[in-house]
Structures are given as C-alpha cells and as structure tokens.
Regions:
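A short helix->beta-strand "capping" segment at the edge of beta-propeller domains
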Residues: 2-38, 67-69, 335
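WD40/WD-repeat beta-propeller blade N-cap
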Residues: 32-39, 75-81, 117-124, 162-168, ...
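A short beta-strand motif characteristic of beta-propeller blades
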Residues: 27-34, 69-74, 111-117, 156-161, ...
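WD40-repeat beta-propellers
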Residues: 60-64, 102-106, 147-152, 190-195, ...
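Loop/turn segments within WD40 beta-propeller blades
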Residues: 43-49, 85-90, 128-134, 171-179, ...
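Blade-level signature of beta-propeller repeat domains, shared across WD40, Kelch, NHL, RCC1
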Residues: 603-632
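Conserved strand-to-loop turn within each blade of WD40 beta-propeller repeats
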Residues: 55-56, 96-99, 139-143, 183-187, ...
Length: 632
C-alpha cells in the first residue's frame, strides 16, 4: 500500500498523510516462528495448502508458502503468542497466547477480530477446530483447568476438557461425525473425548513413558497418532480410541515434537530433536524417507526439528519442518535435500543498513537481539543468515564499507566488532575486542568509528588505530567522508574531522534539552539530522552548525533511526512510538506518517529502490517495505 499525501485542516499550515491500514505495507518480510528448546512449536496450513500460520513474538504471521516474501501480520495480542490454526473453511484463524487468551479473526478480509476468549490462566499450547469450523478446543497450562471447548462465534461452552493432571501439549479433533477429540500432555496420558458437546470417554495412560508432545487424527478420521519425549509413536482407532499398536521403536534418537498427516491418510511425518524429519507408512509401520537437517553427524542444537506440517490441498508432496533456529525447511517427498530453507529473525531487529553493489544489486542487512545478522535481497525479499563465528547477543550497529569486494562491520553487546564478506555472506573470521559496550558504529573513508559510553574507537581492517575521548557520555555516532558527528547524553553534538587514527573537534552544537539518540548525515554531507530521546528531530548545517529546521516534533518517544534520501531533501525517521515519518526539508510542514508500523517500536529505517520506497525493521522481528508517494 502506498503512503499518500493529504490535508489535516486541524493543523492549519501543516499537511500530513496517515496510512489508513498499517497492516498492509507493500511487503512484509516476516519474522520466523518463535521457538523454545524442549518444546514443540505448532505450524498450520490452510485447506488449499497456500498459506502457513505461526506465532512469532507478540504477532501471528500468515505467510504464502509459494512466495514467502508475501505475508500478513496480526498484532492484536498483548503478550507472547504461542499458536495459530486456520479454520477448515479457510475464512478464520484462531490464535492463542501466553496469558491464556484465544482470539478468532478474519484472515481473508481486513483481519477484524471476531472474538476474544479466556481459556486458561496460563499458556495456550495448542488448539483445534472441528470440521464444521464451529467449535474450538484450546489447551495449555492452567490452574483450574488445562483446556476448554467453545463455539468460536459466541464463546459458549460446548464441552468439558477433563482427565489431565498436568499441562496439555496438543489437541486434535476428528473432522468427521461422530465427533471425537484427543488431548495429550505432560502427565503421559492421552485422553479421548466424545462430542459434541465434548466429554471424557477414556484415558490411555500406560503407553507413553514420558511427556506426550503431539497428537493428530488422520484426514479420513480412521486413525489417531501420538508422539512424545519417549521417542515412541502410538496408533489408535480414530472412532473408538482403542490402541492399534506402536511403530518405529528406536527409529528416532531424540524426543519427537510434532506429527502431521498426508492428505491420503496413509502416511504421516514426524519431527524430532535428533534433527531428523521422517515420513512413515502407516500400514507397514516403517520409515519411507528421512531427512537429516544439517547433515549426518551434525551437532548443532539449533537444527533440532520442533515442528512440522504437511499442507493439504497441494499436489507437489511438499512438507514444511521447523528448526529450533526458526528456519523453515521445505522438504519434498522423494527428494533427498531441502528444496528451500526460509530464514529470517526470531528476535527484535535492533539494527539495519543497506549495501549497493557495483552491479546494481541492492541488499538490506539486519541484526537482532540474539546476535543474528541477515542479508536480504531487496528484489525478492528473501533472507540469508550470515554463516560463521557470529555474535552472541544484541547487535548494536551495522555499517558498510567498500573494502575488498565489500564488507559489513557489526558491533554487539558481546563487546566485539566483526566483519562480513558481502559476496560470500559469511563472517571473515576476524574479530576484535572493544574497550566497552558499543552504542553505535559508522564508516569514514573505510575508517570504522565505534561509539561506547566513554570514547570513540577508530579501527581499520578491524584493528584498532586510535581512540577519541569525548567530553560527555556518548549515545550515537555518524560519519560522512572525513567528518564525524558524536551525540551525547547532555544533548550535545560534536562535529569532528577524521584523519587517520584521530578525531579533531571542529564544532559543538547544543541541540535540545534531551539526550541525542540518532544521527544521520545527508548524502552530500552538507546537513546533519539529529533525533533525541523525546521524539524531536532537528537539522543543522554541517559547515557552521547553524540550525536549518526544528519543526519535526511528531514522534512521541525516542527516535531510533534516521536516513536521508539521495537528493538530500527527504528524511525518514523511526521511533519507539511504533511510527515512521517521512519529512521534507524544502517544505518542513509537509510530512507523511505510518502509524503502528512495527509492534512495540521501529528500530531501523532506510531508503531503497532509488528513494521510491522505505524499508523498516523493528521489535516484531519483521522487515517491511513502504511505497512513498505525494511528498515534494
């Protein structure tokens, strides 16, 4: 959706535009699913096999399976989301969160919430729809109860989920009549229910010897399967609940976290902590194909398989598994290697920069709270995680240089600076210890400036060349050619000349009464934009430090990122207030606004596509692209 200009008469001379529906930018490059070691993560696909639904941070993402760069985000949950399931009709999604709330919402229209229901006073672990798309059973960890059955439109009780003594991990409803349901949990029990209304029928407590993580009825309703931490797979009659037997003893070498059926009900797939995904023939009770994610002998815990779905309605035999790292693995039956691996961020994106190659290829680079750095192809919206010896925690800044074939330097709260080879998409292997926790990073003619609270370190090829002791506590740094700007918590900006291994103070600017939080030079270096902790943005001439504009005050909290377009007339800013503003230097009273661009805050903004679009990243771990129109 384009951001367009419009009039706001109540503001007199000020003209602004507000994006009517911020949930529909031109593109959403979605966060990957949130995962927790030792817990299953639920994946769901719609009846046509076109979209994937999953929980990530406090959002739910609906993602195109064939084009993962196309996604939709639901942001009405107030706390960490845990599960999302499409209704069989395909018109609605039910999603749960860590506070025990289930929300039902429209997934084909405007995303309007149709109902909000309190199920348990704890985490929702799973939920299931009946075949009529009328009833929902939601289960999890509570105090008074571990699950509840409701009608989706009214929340009225349509049964009782009883029989469990510990949290329920998974639930499934038979899609045919007579209605049946099954729930499994930490008490090693499978409870079978008759419905509707759903009520306890029988309990199976002597088959599994450890936590049961997953259960599912076959699409034709004939068979029920359960899997768990004891690495066992049990089959039951889908109508009566009677045990049919166990298959696959000893096949998996780790906990089995998830199970999903093929549409023909003759096969199902399992995902395990042993890093394998296996297809099973139900009648033969044997594995027909297995994938070892990461290869044989792989010891990377992040490759544990914690979720899987076999999308119905497709003819290409595609199934999708989830790694603990958040990677979505596209596996095709009959093909030994993954067809595709979808990568991205699971945690809050904390830094963003751009890199343009000599061949014209444009990439975005993002860093997140967990130390992950990803490269995004702007043309396709696909991400690639940078391989090698990565940071272990919060990425505080990224900056590009033209060294060699291109480098991206990153600094993080592990107090190190590392470099990435742009072409190879790998860390170069060199890292240097910093003198303190970094606040930001900038490039001045291939000299790297790293800001910490006490000083500015100057590095070349990743090696320290010198340092500059600031007269205030440093909060931000920016550079253009041989000029640097240093922002402080005393609301001062110091302009310095950069020469080799030293900085020479040139001009001091007292910008406001608030700490400086973001700095950006225009592309020709003539202007400097300064953002502060209260949401104000001011523009100064670099040559003499004179004020050019002080009218950009629409943000209501700390400005986190500022970027100029190539002609130096427009500025984009992002802040913790979740909003993005595009400002005009030639018409300071003319702006564009995107409200609620990123849930819980915008942390990075950049111009792409020759200045016709904006890329943004934020606390929701997503990257979004916005079309800009109407600003002069």
């Amino acid at each position: 959706m384009a951001i367009t200009n419009g009039s706001c008469p109540s503001l007199g001379f000020i003209y602004c535009a507000i994006l009517a529906d911020p949930r529909n930018p031109e593109s959403i490059w979605a966060a990957t699913p949130s995962t927790t070691r030792g817990q299953p993560t639920q994946l769901s696909s719609d009846a046509k096999g076109e979209r994937l639904a999953y929980a990530s941070n406090k959002s739910i993402f609906l993602r195109s399976i064939d084009n993962p760069a196309i996604a939709r985000q639901y942001t009405e949950h107030k706390v960490q989301t845990t599960v999302a399931r499409f209704s069989p009709s395909g018109f609605y999604v039910a999603s749960g969160d860590s506070s025990g709330i289930v929300r039902v919402w429209d997934c084909v229209g405007e995303g309007i919430t149709k109902g909000e229901y309190s199920i348990v006073n704890g985490r929702i672990n799973d939920l299931a729809w009946d075949g009529d798309s009328q009833r929902i059973i939601a289960v999890g960890d509570g105090k008074q109860r571990y699950g509840h059955c409701i009608s989706w439109d009214s929340g009225n009780t349509v049964g009782e989920i009883s029989g469990h003594t510990q949290q329920i991990n998974s639930v499934s409803i038979r899609q045919q009549r007579p209605l049946r349901a099954a729930a499994v949990g930490d008490d090693k029990a499978l409870i079978f229910y008759h419905g509707a209304p759903f009520k306890f029928n029988m309990g199976v407590r002597d088959k599994h010897t450890n936590y049961i993580y997953g259960t599912s009825f076959s699409p034709d309703g004939s068979t029920l399967v359960s899997v768990g931490a004891d690495r066992k797979i049990w089959l039951y009659d889908g109508k009566t609940g009677e045990t049919k037997g166990q298959i696959g003893e000893g096949e998996h070498k780790g906990s089995i976290f998830a199970v999903s059926w093929a549409k023909d009900s003759r096969k199902f797939v399992t995902a395990s902590a042993d890093k394998t995904v296996k297809i099973w023939d139900v009648e033969a009770g044997k594995v027909t194909q297995a994938w070892n994610i990461g290869g044989e002998g792989n010891t990377n815990v992040q490759d544990q398989q914690v979720g899987v779905v076999w999308p119905q309605g497709r003819s290409d035999n595609l199934l999708i598994s989830l790694s603990l790292s958040g990677d979505l693995n596209y596996l095709v039956e009959g093909t030994p290697e993954p067809r595709q691996i979808i990568q991205g961020h699971q945690k809050n994106i904390t830094s963003l920069t751009t890199y343009g190659s000599s061949s014209g290829e444009e990439t975005l680079w993002t860093g997140s709270f967990d130390g992950r750095v990803c490269s995004w192809d702007v043309a396709t919206g696909t991400a690639e995680e940078i391989e090698g010896d990565r940071h272990s925690t919060y990425i505080a800044g990224l900056t590009p240089t033209q060294e060699g074939a291109g480098r991206i330097y990153s600094v993080a709260w592990d107090d190190t600076i590392r470099s990435v080879d742009v072409g190879a998409k790998t860390y170069t292997g060199s890292s240097s210890k910093l003198s303190g926790q970094p606040k930001g990073i900038a490039t001045s003619n291939n000299t790297i400036l790293v800001a910490s609270s006490d000083n500015i370190e100057l590095l070349k090829d990743g090696q320290k060349q010198g340092e500059f002791k600031a007269k205030f506590s440093v909060t931000a740094v920016a550079a253009h050619e041989n000029v640097a700007a240093i922002g402080g918590d005393d609301s001062t900006v110091q302009i310095c000349d950069v020469s080799g291994s030293s900085l020479t103070p040139k001009t001091d600017i007292k910008v406001s009464r608030n700490p400086v939080s973001a700095l950006a030079f225009s592309c020709d270096g003539s202007h400097l934009a300064v953002g502060d902790s209260r949401g104000r943005i001011l523009v100064y001439k670099v040559a003499d430090g004179s004020l050019v504009n002080d009218r950009w005050t629409a943000h209501t909290s700390r400005v986190t990122s500022i970027a100029w377009n190539e002609d130096g007339n427009r500025v984009v800013s992002g802040a913790l207030d979740t909003n993005i503003f595009v400002w005009s230097l030639s018409n300071p009273g003319d702006w564009l606004q995107v409200s609620n661009a990123h849930k819980e805050g915008v942390n990075g903004v950049a111009w792409i596509a020759g200045g016709s679009k904006i890329a943004s990243a934020g606390a929701d771990a997503a990257v979004k692209v916005w079309q800009v129109e109407g600003l002069k």
